[in-house]
Structure formats: structure tokens, C-alpha cells
Amino acid sequence: MNGIISKAALEARRARYPAGCRVALVRTSDPYTPLVPGDLGTVDFLDSIGTIFISWDNGSTLGMAFGEDEVRRV
């Protein structure tokens, strides 16, 4: 994936992950995070390049990058 999100994909992502919704981590490309698959968090917002900023229940605030990381709604 080239990491560039289309306007339509960005709007779909915003609709799927609105602020306040709960998510679970599926995978992340960050080798230094303490997050593991299944960890839960709450979506804060999405930025203009599709990164989902999440307040994780473990206290982390790691964002999930479009094309690199994956979460699912719970």
C-alpha cells in the first residue's frame, strides 16, 4: 500500500470509526509499543491522512496509521 488515502476512503474511515467508538487492536507495525492484539481503546479522532488517534485502556495514546496498522470496532 502506498500510504495515501483517497477522500472517499477517508470519509468511509471517519464514518466507521467516529470519536467515542470502542476498538480492539488487530495489528500494529510499531515494534516498540506495549500494545498487543486484542487491547482495547476509545477513538479520539481521525486526522486528514487517515490516522486513527486512540486512547488505549493501558494509558497509551498511539495512533493507528492508514495502511500500516489495523483495528476493529467492538
PLM features: residue spans?
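Basic/aromatic-rich interaction segments and small domains that mediate binding to polyanionic partners
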Residues: N2-V74
